Amino acid sequence: MSANRRQLRGSQRINKSKGKRKEYSKILIVAEGEKTEPQYFEKFAALLKAKAVRVVRLDPIGLGKDPLSVVLDADKRRKKERRDGDAFDQVWCVVDVDEHAGLERACIEAGRLDIKIAISSPCFEIWLLWHFEERTAWVDAATLARELKKRGFSGKSIPTGFPYANYVAAMNRANKCEQVRIKHAPPNPSSSVASLISALVTAYTEPIKT
């Protein structure tokens, strides 16, 4: 068994069948984070052998803390792919709450453009911590950074051996927190990254019938 498969042991398996080639959803993920978020989704997609998933790392220079820019960038990339005749089936943006004054506008625009948005409060690191333990009480970004450092994190890099296979536990822990009812004002802690993970797992365990 390969190292990749061992990391996802116990999770849903990809249904591979010989013969007729299956077509899978083509998914675009545009991540606001400079390193952590793209690294997580690139690795997760690789473990799923999700070759039709494209993860985009946005250059933070000139972007600032503006989730609307993430949404607009995703729409731009989707339009280009559509013009090239190979449209995405799903488009996702991954952003943090942090101190985003423009989050409401970004959510409105994402809804108008039919782009899904995964928001974490206070930041994406809460989703990472849920792979290790339950956390339902209010928490800030600095505390999350300290907790993850105890688990081998160094700066924004995800350590080798991170338990990606614990994504189901992370989803369950996210569900125990107050649910996101108003997208631009999610409770702390919370994360709708679980919805994105669910979309990826579903797309790559249940091939689209052609």
Model regions and ranges:
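Short acidic, Gly/Ser-rich segments with clustered Asp/Glu that frequently serve as metal-coordination loops
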Residues: 33-36
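Conserved beta-strand elements of the Class I
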Residues: 28-30
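Glycine-rich, highly charged phosphate/nucleotide-binding loops
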Residues: 70-80
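C-terminal accessory helical subdomains adjacent to catalytic cores in phosphodiester-
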Residues: 1-9, 13-26, 38, 42-60, ...
